């Protein structure tokens, strides 16, 4: 789907009465890299059990002090060599994936580790940067539902905005990754806009269950050589997909001690884009993005009955310090040095296996969530092992339930098993471990909300819903009563609502008819469960 460069935003088409946002990049799927940038759319416990390494804790305490500590310098040695598209069967030794230029200045601990161009684009004085507001229930804009109704047992497994905000990526039970552009109606100058159903512009099919997926950390739609997606699926290599064409660009292979191909359970690109970190059983493997294939660095997390055991199920990098966090299905969190993987601290406190991690933009706090665990936990890196506070959410299954932070670090948003989306205001100082209550909750649909993603530049919240439905045994009728023509196992009480939805969170006028029942397309109904 191509977006015209001639379109301009009209304040009247916004869900709010605010003025237009700054310029937004074109979607990777648009393939028109010579065009001018497209304008943006208008529109609980007293004390949890914590296990820490005394020596490691002291080390990380010295390195991760308050903001007055000496900055840590990190030098990135990145290859600028670009690669052709590489077939999965044959990967030349000299093949490489594109990364940023080598003449990049050193970054200090207080700087965000993002791509730095030689000539930064000028910022128009008239540009306005949006901020999120949850003083009222978000307004529904558009969504996609027909795409996930072709199979009776299909459901979404999360959604992730691209780093530049040009498009959104989804995962689903049919083993297909889909990329959607922003709705074209957001560029309309009409006062009354009827949003059509969103249609994916790309579909990338994996061979089996997708374990994890992620965007390239320096992805920019203006640079096609940075627009790609990584995915890992059962009994398959790690695949790199072209976000412009949907073609396979490269593969990374990991092998166990029997020289058998093994699949990664979690993926995360380093902030500078030079490395791909992958989680395995008691191991993190680090691949160089400039050299696809099987060559990698193996970092063991558990040795001699010490360390972090279990499958490394999620990974996240600190935006301000040279370290990364690993969550495992063994219910532990580990902090490791970026350069050599040396352990810094080991934390515990969750009741189930860790499924998602997220660092605060300031780099001092990070959040963790687990399966079959009713709490999100917040940790302070300046005091390793100290739990800052907890946030309650309903997670009663083994499904991965995502949460996300807005770019300013003020709001944290999470779904839950019953479908309710909760929003917490985490700004301010919290010195004691306590329960933090949400400032607002709302119900997008009557099914599990497993994915939430906050747009990096616009007040747009994306939600993904659905869960696996297990059949229930049917009761045989009493003697003399007619028996229903139903199988012994039935899904007649299940009403799945599998859909991707976009919500405007810019603090505009109240949405019309908030209590109106949802129609067959899945749009219109938003139920406020509670607000403060």
UniProtKB/Swiss-Prot annotation:
PTM sites of type Phosphoserine: 27, 61, 83, 476
The UniProt record lists the keyword Chaperone: yes
CC per GO annotation: Cajal body; chromosome, telomeric region; cytosol; site of double-strand break; telomerase holoenzyme complex
PTM remark: Phosphorylated at Ser-61 by ATM in response to DNA damage, promoting its interaction with histone H2AX and localization to sites of DNA double-strand breaks.
The entry's keywords: Chaperone, Chromosome, DNA damage, DNA repair, Nucleus, Phosphoprotein, Repeat, RNA-binding, Telomere, WD repeat
Residues with the Phosphothreonine modification: 474
A biological process from GO: telomerase RNA localization to Cajal body
Record Pfam families: WD40
GO molecular function, one term: telomerase RNA binding
Record InterPro entries: SWT21/TCAB1_mRNA_Telomere, WD40/YVTN_repeat-like_dom_sf, WD40_repeat_dom_sf, WD40_rpt
Assembly notes: Component of the telomerase holoenzyme complex composed of one molecule of TERT, one molecule of WRAP53/TCAB1, two molecules of H/ACA ribonucleoprotein complex subunits DKC1, NOP10, NHP2 and GAR1, and a telomerase RNA template component (TERC). The telomerase holoenzyme complex is associated with TEP1, SMG6/EST1A and POT1. Interacts with the chaperonin-containing T-complex (TRiC) complex; which mediates the folding of WRAP53/TCAB1. Interacts with COIL. Interacts with SMN1. Interacts with RNF8. Interacts with histone H2AX.
Function according to Swiss-Prot or TrEMBL: RNA chaperone that plays a key role in telomere maintenance and RNA localization to Cajal bodies. Specifically recognizes and binds the Cajal body box (CAB box) present in both small Cajal body RNAs (scaRNAs) and telomerase RNA template component (TERC). Essential component of the telomerase holoenzyme complex, a ribonucleoprotein complex essential for the replication of chromosome termini that elongates telomeres in most eukaryotes. In the telomerase holoenzyme complex, required to stimulate the catalytic activity of the complex.
Similarity comment text for this entry: Belongs to the TCAB1 family.
The protein's name in its UniProt record: Telomerase Cajal body protein 1
Organism encoding this protein: Rattus norvegicus
């Amino acid at each position: 789907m191509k977006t015209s460069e001639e379109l301009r935003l009209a304040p009247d088409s916004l869900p709010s009465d605010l003025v237009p946002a700054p310029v937004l990049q074109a979607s990777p799927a648009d393939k028109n890299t010579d065009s001018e940038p497209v304008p943006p759319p208008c529109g609980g416990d007293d004390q949890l059990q914590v296990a820490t390494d005394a020596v490691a804790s002291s080390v990380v305490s010295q390195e991760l002090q308050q903001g007055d500590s000496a900055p840590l310098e990190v030098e990135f040695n990145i290859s600028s060599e670009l690669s052709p598209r590489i077939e999965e069967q044959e990967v030349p030794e000299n093949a490489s994936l594109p990364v940023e230029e080598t003449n990049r200045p050193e970054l200090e601990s207080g700087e965000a580790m993002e791509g730095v161009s030689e000539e930064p684009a000028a910022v128009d004085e008239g540009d306005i940067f949006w901020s999120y507001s949850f003083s009222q229930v978000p307004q529904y804009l558009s969504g996609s539902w027909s795409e996930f109704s072709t199979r009776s047992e299909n459901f979404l497994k999360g959604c992730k905005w691209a780093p530049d905000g040009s498009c959104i990526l989804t995962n689903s039970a049919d083993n297909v990754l889909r990329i959607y552009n922003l709705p074209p109606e957001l560029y309309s100058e009409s006062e009354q806009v009827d949003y059509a159903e969103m249609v994916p512009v790309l579909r990338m099919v994996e061979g089996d269950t997708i374990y994890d997926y992620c965007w390239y950390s320096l992805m920019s739609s203006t640079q096609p050589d940075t627009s790609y997606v990584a995915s890992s699926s059962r009994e398959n290599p790690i695949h790199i997909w072209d976000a412009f064409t949907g073609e396979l660009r490269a593969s990374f292979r990991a092998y166990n001690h029997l020289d058998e191909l093994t699949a990664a359970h979690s993926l995360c690109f380093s902030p500078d884009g030079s490395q791909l970190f992958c989680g395995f059983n008691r191991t993190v493997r680090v691949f160089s993005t400039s050299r696809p294939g099987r060559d990698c660095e193996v970092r063991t997390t558990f040795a001699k009955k010490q360390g972090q055991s279990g499958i490394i199920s999620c990974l996240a990098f600190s935006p301000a310090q040279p370290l990364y966090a690993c969550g495992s299905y063994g219910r532990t969190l580990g902090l490791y040095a970026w350069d050599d993987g040396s352990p810094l601290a080991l934390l515990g406190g969750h009741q189930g296996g860790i499924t998602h991690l997220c660092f605060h933009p300031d780099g001092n706090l990070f959040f963790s969530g687990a399966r079959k665990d009713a709490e999100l936990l917040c940790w302070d890196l300046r005091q390793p092992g100290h739990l800052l506070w907890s946030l309650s959410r309903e997670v009663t299954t083994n499904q991965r339930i995502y949460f996300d932070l807005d770019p300013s670090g003020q709001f944290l948003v999470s779904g839950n098993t019953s479908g309710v989306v909760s929003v917490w205001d985490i700004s301010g100082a919290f010195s004691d471990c306590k329960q933090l209550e949400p400032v607002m909750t709302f119900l997008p649909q009557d099914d599990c909300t497993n994915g939430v993603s906050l747009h990096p530049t616009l007040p747009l919240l994306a939600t993904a819903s659905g869960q696996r439905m297990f059949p229930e045994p049917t009761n045989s009728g009493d003697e003399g009563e007619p028996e229903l023509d139903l199988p012994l196992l039935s899904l007649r009480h299940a009403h799945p609502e599998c859909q991707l939805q976009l919500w405007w969170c810019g603090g505009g006028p109240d949405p019309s008819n908030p209590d109106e029942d949802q129609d067959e397309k899945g749009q219109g109904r938003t139920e406020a469960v509670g607000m403060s």
